[in-house]
């Protein structure tokens, strides 16, 4: 989407855009991680203010609320804050910074002991490793964490810019009524290097082993790479497969009835076209209706209808067509009666309840 937006000078800003599509990534397939998955995205272009980040975070929370994942938590941080801290430790090479940020991104998955070994292999002293792990361990209530950080932050333009952006995002999230759903967690950095500001991930608190259900953040420099202009941007993306896994675990899939409510049975082939018309008429009244495409004998049709657990069978023959009636059979009670075709819809609804 960024490549498209970066070259569309005709679009009025701010640009709000979304898409859904298949995504490939080079990854080792494992629980809740896939090489191919279906992803949705929502992005805002042209706004540098934290209000855009807050709106994306609020949208993310609203999406999870709408599907029933009410016990979710959005963990937020800021890449400038983390990178500024690392630079304060004397790490200046961008390659080294990107490598260390990727390790921080894995702390929650691999644990602090494994992360310590990876930091040590990267050439860091024990003191620096301890300080980085301590920094990444900072998390909690936004007001409390930001209050403590403000007192203890080391000097540096980048780290203070990151703090300003993060604080501004929290303020605006509060205005959108979503502050109870967020938590500051400095271990959230998003491992992809194009993120350069506020970042976040959302988890179902009852199933964090699934991983982040969605995540995103600010990527202000990406438009310049794909187009001819600088344009601030922020967004969010999520995979349908992980979302479905979380919903399935909590039995949150809606109870959508797939089987027909009414099955139109024909006495012989001569009335088959009439049965098709009746079924279609019932469908036009939002009654799930079906008929036997295989045109089997009456007994086989009734057996098939019973296997589908339909509520009602309409039995149609030449006499019923002549009289403008149909025999309506309640499949639960076995009761059968003749009804006028003109009143069949009302009779069916009464029986189905």
Segments (PLM) and residue ranges:
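Positively charged, Gly/Ser-enriched RNA/tRNA-binding surfaces
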Residues: 3-70, 118-353
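Short, conserved phosphate-binding/catalytic loop or strand-edge motifs used
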Residues: 34-40, 76-84
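Phosphate-rich ligand and nucleic-acid binding surfaces
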Residues: 84-91, 109, 126
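Acidic, His- and aromatic-enriched active-site or binding-groove loops in soluble protein domains
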Residues: 91-112, 204-206
């Amino acid at each position: 989407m960024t490549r498209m937006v970066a070259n569309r000078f005709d679009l009025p800003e701010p640009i709000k855009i979304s898409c859904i599509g298949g995504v490939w990534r080079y990854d080792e397939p494992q629980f809740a991680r896939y090489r191919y998955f279906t992803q949705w995205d929502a992005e805002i272009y042209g706004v540098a203010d934290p209000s855009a980040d807050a709106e994306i975070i609020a949208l993310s929370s609203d999406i999870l609320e709408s599907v029933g994942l009410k016990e979710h938590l959005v963990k937020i941080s800021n890449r400038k804050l983390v990178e500024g801290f690392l630079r304060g430790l004397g790490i200046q090479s961008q390659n080294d910074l990107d490598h260390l940020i990727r390790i921080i991104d894995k702390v929650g998955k691999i644990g602090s002991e494994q992360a310590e070994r990876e930091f040590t292999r990267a050439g860091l002293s024990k003191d620096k490793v301890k300080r980085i792990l301590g920094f990444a361990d900072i998390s909690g209530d936004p007001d409390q964490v930001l209050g403590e950080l403000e007192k203890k932050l080391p000097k540096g333009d980048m780290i203070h810019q990151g703090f300003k952006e993060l604080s501004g995002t929290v303020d605006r999230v509060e205005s959108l009524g979503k502050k109870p759903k967020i938590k500051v967690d400095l271990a959230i950095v998003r491992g992809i290097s194009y993120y350069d500001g506020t970042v976040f991930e959302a988890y179902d608190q009852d199933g964090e082993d699934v991983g982040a259900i969605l995540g995103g953040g600010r990527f202000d420099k990406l438009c310049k790479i794909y187009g001819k202009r600088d344009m601030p941007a922020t967004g969010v993306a999520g995979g349908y497969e992980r979302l479905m896994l979380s919903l399935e675990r909590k039995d949150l899939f809606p109870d959508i009835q797939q089987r027909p409510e009414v099955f139109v049975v024909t006495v012989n082939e001569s009335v088959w076209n009439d049965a098709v018309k009746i079924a279609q008429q019932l469908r036009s009244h939002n009654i799930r209706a079906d008929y036997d495409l295989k045109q089997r004998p009456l007994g086989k049709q009734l057996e098939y209808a019973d296997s589908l657990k339909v509520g009602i069978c309409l039995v149609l023959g030449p006499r019923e067509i002549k009289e403008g009636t149909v025999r309506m059979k309640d499949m639960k009670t076995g009761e059968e009666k003749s009804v006028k075709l003109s009143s069949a819809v009302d009779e069916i609804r009464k029986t189905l309840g």
